[in-house]
Every structure is written in structure tokens, then in C-alpha cells.
């Protein structure tokens, strides 16, 4: 360290901070009569590329993505009950949440290859893949 400064990140991109993000949501609701209501919504989330490691490793960043979600529901107009189908990440985007190098992986690679350094191993944790759920609410 020089003058107590361990790492100077001046001008560097912050980890986990995309340059742009957007969210668009559309909601629709309609009274069907006979005490029934139908509603639906669609949401779109976008993100530009961002780093998922604190050391800003370009080998394991998250590229830009667009993620879609939707919901449709049918229920009573008094809110007593509601049946919904909910979908998230409908286009099944693979979104890295966090990642980095695997500790000691370089050492194991060296040992397995007879001493030659073949590279660095990376791992990542991903957000949930496409999922669709059915939900029933009943208020007593």
C-alpha cells in the first residue's frame, strides 16, 4: 500500500452497476359482471452489461438482457378469492447474479495436467430460470 491506499478504482466502473436499466409495466383490469373480475399485467425489465465481481473481471460479467414477466388473474369483485397464473423470466434469460474465480482451481488444474497452467476456472450463481406458477388466494 502507498499512503494507506490499497486499491485505486478512480474512473473504474462499479461492480453490480449497469449503466442503464429500464422497467415497463402494463396493467389491465375488467369487470366481467356476475361478481367476477379479470386482470392481467405484463412487465419488461432491461439491463445493460455489468460486472458481477468486485475485481471487475471481464471474463465473468453479465451481458445486457431483457426479461419478461406476465400475470393473468380471475377473481371475485369483492376480493374474497382470486386464481392467478404468473410467469417470470418467460424468455428464459440466463442472468448471472454473482460469480468469480474458484479458489484453488488453478492449483488443481496444474496438478491434474502435470504442472502446466491451463487457465482459471470460474463459477457463477444465476437468477431463477423461466418459471410459471399457479396461485389461489382466499380471504376469510
Where are these regions (language model features)?
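C-terminal beta-signal and adjacent terminal beta-strands/loops
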Residues: 44-53, 74-140
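C-terminal extracellular loops and terminal segments
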Residues: 1-69, 126-128
